[in-house]
From Swiss-Prot:
<feature type="region of interest" description="Disordered">
    <location>
        <begin position="1"/>
        <end position="21"/>
    </location>
</feature>
<dbReference type="GO" id="GO:0005085">
    <property type="term" value="F:guanyl-nucleotide exchange factor activity"/>
</dbReference>
<keyword id="KW-0344">Guanine-nucleotide releasing factor</keyword>
<feature type="compositionally biased region" description="Polar residues">
    <location>
        <begin position="164"/>
        <end position="175"/>
    </location>
</feature>
<keyword id="KW-0175">Coiled coil</keyword>
<feature type="coiled-coil region">
    <location>
        <begin position="54"/>
        <end position="128"/>
    </location>
</feature>
<feature type="compositionally biased region" description="Low complexity">
    <location>
        <begin position="754"/>
        <end position="770"/>
    </location>
</feature>
<feature type="compositionally biased region" description="Low complexity">
    <location>
        <begin position="510"/>
        <end position="520"/>
    </location>
</feature>
<feature type="domain" description="DH">
    <location>
        <begin position="273"/>
        <end position="448"/>
    </location>
</feature>
<dbReference type="InterPro" id="IPR042849">
    <property type="entry name" value="ARHGEF33"/>
</dbReference>
<feature type="compositionally biased region" description="Polar residues">
    <location>
        <begin position="773"/>
        <end position="783"/>
    </location>
</feature>
<feature type="region of interest" description="Disordered">
    <location>
        <begin position="98"/>
        <end position="209"/>
    </location>
</feature>
<feature type="region of interest" description="Disordered">
    <location>
        <begin position="504"/>
        <end position="550"/>
    </location>
</feature>
<feature type="compositionally biased region" description="Basic and acidic residues">
    <location>
        <begin position="98"/>
        <end position="113"/>
    </location>
</feature>
<protein>
    <recommendedName>
        <fullName>Rho guanine nucleotide exchange factor 33</fullName>
    </recommendedName>
</protein>
<keyword id="KW-0488">Methylation</keyword>
<feature type="compositionally biased region" description="Basic residues">
    <location>
        <begin position="826"/>
        <end position="835"/>
    </location>
</feature>
Length: 850
C-alpha cells in the first residue's frame, strides 16, 4: 500500500515539472525556427535580386542581338540589291559586247569578201591586159580604173577588226562636226557678239579637227563600205548567210544592229562636241580673266607712280571693276572644276544661272561698269594725254573693250553648248533659261553697249591717227637729217619718242577673246626695236598725202572676217608681243560739219539665234549690228533721223576736251533708282538715270535756243561722243530675271515748277510715268538723246561733295538758298541765254533753279 502511494505521489509531482520544461523547449524551438526562417527569407531576397539582375542582362543582350540581326538583314538586303544591279549591268554589257562582236565579225567578213572581189577584179584586169599586150598591163600596185567602185581601196588580205571599227569613228565625228560648222557659218547669231566677226570655231578646234580631216580622207579612201552603206551590206551579208526558211528575219536583225550602232556613235559624237564647246568656254574665260587682271595691274601702276594724284584722277577705272574681276575669277574656278572633270552628262547652266541671278548683283555691277566707262575714257584721254604715255592709253582702251563684249560672248558660248545639248539632258532647261536672261539683258541695254563700243572705237582711231602723225613727223625729220650727222639709231629714237609701236598702227582693236591683249609696254625692248627698225625701213619720206594714204592701208575693211576666236595654248606667250587684231568698226566716222541725218548704219537680216528658243525674242524686233555684234533692237532705230542736225554743227572751238564744260549740264533724277538695293561696293550713284530718262536742263536749253532761232554750240567733248540715231531706251533695271513684269518700274520723277512756257511744256511731257517698254519719244526729245546719255555719265566728274549734295530730291531743295560765288557761281555765266538779256534770266541747271 505504501509503495502504491509513493508512485502516485511521484506521478502527481511529475506533471507539475513537465509543462514548464516543455514550454521552455517550445520557446527555444520557436526562436530557432524564427531565426532560420529569417535567414531563409534573407536568402530568398538575395536570390530574387540576383534573378532580377540576370533578367536585365538577358534583356539587354537580347535587344543588342536583335539590333545586330536587323542590321545584318538590312546589309544583306542592300547587298542583294547591289548584286542584282551589278548582275543586270553585267548582262547589259555582255549583250552589248555580243552585239559589237557580231558587228565586228560582220565587218571583218565584209572586208574579206570585198578584198576577194578586188583581187578577182585585179586578176581579171591583169589577164585582160596580158591578152591586150604587155604595154597595157598595169603595174602590180596600181589602182583599178575609174569604172570600179573600189578604185581607192587598197585592202590587205586580213585586218584586225578593232582597227576597222576604230577607224570609222573619226570619220563620222568629223562629218557631223562639219555639218555643225556649216550651221555656225550660216547662223549669223553665232558670228556673234563677242568681237566683231569672231568665228565661234576656235583655232584649237580647227587644229583638233585637222587630224580628223586626214582620218576622214583615209577612211573615205580605204574604208568606203563604212557606216553609210550599212543597209546594203547588211543585205549582202543576209543573202550570203541566210537560210531558205527564214531570210526576212535575219535581214531585219542585221539592219537593227546597224541602226543601234549608228545611234550609239551619234550619241558619243554629240557628247564629244559638247565637251569641246565647254572646253572652248573655259579657255575663253581663262584668257578673259588674264585680260581684266592686267587692268588691275595698270591701275596699281597708276596709283603707285604718283601718291599725290587727286581723287578725280584716281577714278580712271570704274569702281565696279574689282567686283567683276572677283566674280569672273570665281566663275573660272567653277568652270575648271566642272569641265576638267567632265562626266557623261556635264552641267554648266547652274553656274550661269547663279551668276545672272538677282541676288548675285553681277548684272547690276556690269551695268554700273557700262555707265562709268564714258567718264573713265574721258579721264584716260585727259590724264594720260597730260603724261604723254600713249602706250598705256592704247592698252586701257583695248582692255575696256574686252569687258564691254563679255556678256555677248557668254550668250554665244551658251548658245553653242545648247546647240549640242539634247532636250532630255538635265542641262538643257538651265541653258535655255540662261540664254533667255542674257537676251533680255542685252536687248534692254543695247544702247549702252553700242555707245561704249562706238566711243572706244573712235578714241582708238583718234589715238592711232595722232600716233601715225607723230611717227611720220619723226620719220620725216629723221630722213631730212639723214644726210647730215644723224646716227643710225636716230630713227628708232624718233619712233620711240612718237609713242607708237607696230601693234598700234595696225587695227583699232584686237578680237575680244582671240588672245591675250597686246600690252605694248610689257614687250621686250629688243623686240620693240626690231619692229620699229622694220617699220622705218618699210616707210620712205614723201608727201603728207602719201603718208595719209599709207596710213589708210592699215585700217580694217568693214567686210573683213575676223580670225578665229581662240588661240592654242602654246600661242599665249606670243600673243602678248603680237600685233593687235582687228574688229569691224562702225560704218561711219562723220566729221564735225557732217549732218547727222546722213549717217547710216549697216544692218543684217534677222537670223535664227536658236531654233529651240525663238519664242523668247519679241516679234517686233530686228537684228542690229554694232561693233560686229548682232543684238535685238526695236525696229524704229533706223527709221528715225535727226530733225535738227544744226544743233550739232556749230560747235564751240574754244572749249577744251576736259571735263569742266560737261559736268554742269545734267539735273539729277532720284526716283529712277528708288527701289534699287544698296551694296557695299555699289559704284552707281543714286542719281543714275536710265538711257530713256530726259535731261531737263539740256532739253530746256535746246528748246530756248530753238525759240530764239539760235543753235546752242556743243563742247568738243560732246563731239567726241558717238553720234548715232536715237533708239528706244529703257530704264536700267526695268527687267527682272525672276519675272518679266515691270515690278521695278521707276517712280514718277519729281521736278521743280518751270517758270517758262517751253520749259513747262517739256517738263509736263516728261512727267508721265513710263511703262515697261516706253512709248516712242517725240522729235524734240530725239534730238538731244545721245547728248543726254553722255551728260548723264559725265556728271560724275563733279567733286564728291557736290554729288553728295545731289542726293536730296528737287522738291526738298530751296532753289534760292544755294551759295553764291565759288565753284558754282563761276560757271553760272555758262548757262545764261545769249540774247543780250542784261537781267540774266536763270534756268534749270544741275543743282536746281538758280
Amino acid at each position: 500500500m505504501e509503495k502504491s502511494k509513493a508512485k502516485q505521489g511521484e506521478n502527481e509531482h511529475m506533471p507539475v515539472n513537465n509543462p514548464s520544461t516543455q514550454i521552455y523547449q517550445l520557446q527555444a524551438l520557436a526562436s530557432e525556427l524564427k531565426t532560420g526562417f529569417t535567414e531563409a527569407m534573407q536568402e530568398l531576397t538575395r536570390i530574387q535580386h540576383g534573378e532580377y539582375a540576370l533578367e536585365e542582362k538577358v534583356k539587354s543582350c537580347r535587344c543588342s542581338m536583335e539590333e545586330k540581326v536587323t542590321e545584318m538583314k538590312n546589309s544583306l538586303n542592300y547587298f542583294k540589291e547591289e548584286l542584282s544591279n551589278a548582275m543586270s549591268m553585267i548582262q547589259a554589257i555582255t549583250s552589248k559586247q555580243e552585239e559589237m562582236q557580231q558587228k565586228i565579225e560582220q565587218l571583218q567578213q565584209e572586208k574579206r569578201r570585198e578584198s576577194r572581189k578586188v583581187k578577182a577584179k585585179k586578176a581579171q584586169k591583169e589577164e585582160h591586159g596580158a591578152q591586150a599586150g604587155p604595154a597595157s598591163a598595169p603595174a602590180p600596185g596600181s589602182a583599178p580604173t575609174q569604172g570600179s567602185p573600189f578604185r581607192s581601196i587598197n585592202v590587205p588580205e586580213a585586218g584586225l577588226p578593232s582597227d576597222d571599227f576604230t577607224n570609222m569613228l573619226p570619220s563620222q565625228n568629223y562629218e557631223k562636226a562639219q555639218e555643225s560648222r556649216s550651221v555656225h557659218v550660216g547662223d549669223s547669231n553665232v558670228k556673234g557678239m563677242m568681237g566683231p566677226g569672231v568665228n565661234p570655231t576656235t583655232p584649237e578646234s580647227d587644229e583638233n579637227l585637222k587630224p580628223s580631216l586626214s582620218a576622214e580622207i583615209q577612211s573615205k579612201g580605204h574604208h568606203t563600205p563604212g557606216l553609210w552603206r550599212q543597209p546594203k551590206e547588211g543585205k549582202e551579208w543576209g543573202e550570203e548567210y541566210v537560210t531558205k526558211d527564214h531570210p526576212d528575219k535575219l535581214k531585219d536583225a542585221g539592219q537593227g544592229r546597224h541602226s543601234s550602232l549608228e545611234n550609239v556613235l551619234c550619241e558619243t559624237s554629240l557628247a564629244a562636241k559638247r565637251q569641246t564647246v565647254a572646253l572652248e568656254l573655259l579657255e575663253s574665260e581663262r584668257k578673259y580673266v588674264i585680260n581684266i587682271s592686267l587692268i588691275l595691274k595698270i591701275k596699281a601702276t597708276f596709283q603707285g607712280s604718283d601718291g599725290k594724284r587727286n581723287p578725280k584722277e584716281r577714278s580712271l577705272f570704274p569702281g565696279s571693276l574689282r567686283y567683276l574681276v572677283q566674280q569672273h575669277l570665281d566663275l573660272l574656278h567653277a568652270l575648271q572644276e566642272r569641265v576638267l572633270k567632265w562626266p557623261r552628262q556635264g552641267v554648266l547652266g547652274d553656274l550661269f544661272l547663279k551668276l545672272t541671278n538677282d541676288e548675285n548683283n553681277f548684272l547690276d555691277y556690269y551695268v554700273a561698269y557700262l555707265r562709268d566707262l564714258p567718264e573713265c575714257i574721258s579721264l584716260v584721254h585727259v590724264v594720260v594725254l597730260k603724261e604723254g604715255d600713249e602706250e598705256i592709253k592704247s592698252d586701257i582702251y583695248t582692255l575696256f573693250f574686252h569687258i564691254v563684249q563679255r556678256i555677248p560672248e557668254y550668250l554665244i558660248h551658251l548658245q553653242n553648248v545648247l546647240k549640242f545639248t539634247e532636250q532630255e539632258h538635265p542641262d538643257y532647261y538651265l541653258l535655255l533659261v540662261c540664254v533667255q536672261r542674257l537676251r533680255v539683258f542685252i536687248s534692254h541695254y543695247t544702247l549702252l553697249f553700242q555707245c561704249n563700243e562706238d566711243l572706244l572705237i573712235q578714241k582708238r582711231k583718234k589715238l592711232k591717227k595722232s600716233s601715225m602723225a607723230k611717227l611720220y613727223k619723226g620719220l620725216a625729220s629723221q630722213c631730212a637729217n639723214a644726210g647730215q650727222d644723224a646716227s643710225p639709231n636716230a630713227g628708232q629714237e624718233a619712233v620711240h619718242d612718237s609713242g607708237v609701236h607696230s601693234e598700234e598702227m595696225l587695227q583699232p582693236y584686237p578680237s575680244s577673246s582671240s588672245s591675250a591683249p597686246a600690252v605694248s609696254h610689257l614687250m621686250a625692248p629688243a623686240k620693240k626695236g626690231q619692229q620699229q627698225q622694220s617699220l622705218m625701213e618699210s616707210m620712205q619720206p614723201g608727201k603728207p598725202g602719201d603718208w595719209e594714204l599709207e596710213g589708210r592701208k592699215h585700217e580694217r575693211p568693214e567686210s573683213l572676217l575676223a580670225p578665229a576666236q581662240f588661240c592654242a595654248a602654246e600661242q599665249d606667250v606670243k600673243a602678248l608681243a603680237g600685233p593687235l587684231q582687228a574688229i569691224p568698226e562702225m560704218d561711219f566716222e562723220p566729221s564735225s560739219a557732217e549732218p547727222l541725218g546722213n549717217v547710216e548704219r549697216s544692218l543684217r537680216g534677222p537670223p535664227e539665234l536658236l531654233p529651240d528658243a525663238r519664242g523668247f525674242v519679241p516679234a517686233g524686233y530686228e537684228e542690229f549690228e554694232y561693233g560686229g555684234e548682232i543684238f535685238a533692237l526695236p525696229a524704229p532705230y533706223d527709221e528715225e533721223p535727226f530733225q535738227a542736225p544744226a544743233l550739232f554743227d556749230n560747235c564751240s572751238p574754244a572749249s577744251s576736251e576736259s571735263s569742266l564744260d560737261i559736268c554742269f549740264l545734267r539735273p539729277v533724277s532720284f526716283a529712277m533708282e528708288a527701289e534699287r538695293p544698296e551694296h557695299a561696293l555699289q559704284p552707281l550713284p543714286k542719281s543714275a538715270t536710265s538711257p530713256a530718262s530726259s535731261s531737263g536742263a539740256y532739253k530746256l536749253e535746246a528748246a530756248q535756243a530753238q525759240a530764239h532761232g539760235k543753235a546752242k554750240p556743243l563742247s568738243r567733248s560732246l563731239k567726241e561722243f558717238p553720234r548715232t540715231p536715237p533708239a528706244e531706251g529703257v530704264a536700267p533695271r526695268l527687267y527682272s530675271t525672276r519675272s518679266s513684269s515691270g515690278g521695278r518700274a521707276p517712280l514718277k520723277v519729281e521736278r521743280a515748277p518751270a517758270p517758262h512756257g517751253p520749259a513747262a511744256a517739256a517738263a509736263a511731257s516728261r512727267g508721265a510715268p513710263r511703262t515697261f517698254f516706253p512709248q516712242q519719244r517725240s522729235q524734240s526729245e530725239k534730238q538731244t538723246y545721245l547728248e543726254e546719255m553722255h551728260l548723264e555719265d559725265a556728271t560724275r566728274f563733279c567733286p564728291k561733295e557736290e554729288r553728295e549734295s545731289e542726293q536730296t530730291s528737287f522738291s526738298d531743295q530751296n532753289p534760292r538758298q544755294d551759295q553764291k560765288g565759288g565753284f558754282r557761281s563761276s560757271f553760272r555765266k555758262l548757262f545764261k541765254k545769249k540774247n543780250g538779256n542784261s537781267t540774266g534770266e536763270d534756268f534749270c541747271g544741275p543743282w536746281g533753279w538758280w
